[in-house]
């Protein structure tokens, strides 16, 4: 597993405002989108490209375009949806799938899958899993293996904040045959007894969309 933690003053500034409990949902959503675009620049560094002959107004040349099959972006519902706009603005030609998973509150590293909208065959596809928080790591491992069951061998996870416990769990449980990378804005101190990241930013889904009782 490859882990990349962004080190940039803009990321630090935006992340500080994002964490602030007084930041309203409207600003929170904008900041998530902006942070994801900064992360995506790093996460997409190794996208497959092919030669593309074109003509400029001055002369013919050979440039590069994204190769087929197109990469696929997979937000983990519901909080991952808040990251989708930033990803599609950077990669408008990418396909988008959806995966609904939630943590079993009695068994934090176990996941319940309640929805999916994905191609049956992901062979040869570069997959980008997006979810704001990497807490216990259970959701990320389960989601990655879900993609791998459909043939995915190249998976990049984009998370805003991670906990050390989650990173360790992912390192220990991810299938080593998968080319796997994690890009985060920050690795925080720890998980608390409720498996929330500390200092974290609270419940990302609630802060993006409001609390659902």
From Swiss-Prot:
It comes from the Bacteria. Its cofactor is Mg(2+). Its EC number is 2.4.2.9. Uracil binds at residues 197, 202-204. This is Uracil phosphoribosyltransferase. Pathway: Pyrimidine metabolism; UMP biosynthesis via salvage pathway; UMP from uracil: step 1/1. Belongs to the UPRTase family. InterPro entries: PRibTrfase_dom, PRTase-like, Upp_B, UPRTase/APRTase, Ura_phspho_trans. It comes from Bifidobacterium longum subsp. infantis (strain ATCC 15697 / DSM 20088 / JCM 1222 / NCTC 11817 / S12). HAMAP family: Upp_B. Catalyzes the conversion of uracil and 5-phospho-alpha-D-ribose 1-diphosphate (PRPP) to UMP and diphosphate. Binds 1 Mg(2+) ion per subunit. The magnesium is bound as Mg-PRPP. Allosterically activated by GTP. Keywords: Allosteric enzyme, Glycosyltransferase, GTP-binding, Magnesium, Nucleotide-binding, Transferase. CDD domains: PRTases_typeI. GO terms for molecular function: GTP binding; magnesium ion binding; uracil phosphoribosyltransferase activity. It is an enzyme of class 2 (transferase). It catalyses: UMP + diphosphate = 5-phospho-alpha-D-ribose 1-diphosphate + uracil. One of its GO terms (biological process) is UMP salvage. PANTHER family: ADENINE PHOSPHORIBOSYLTRANSFERASE, URACIL PHOSPHORIBOSYLTRANSFERASE, CHLOROPLASTIC. 5-phospho-alpha-D-ribose 1-diphosphate binds at residues 78, 103, 131-139, 203.
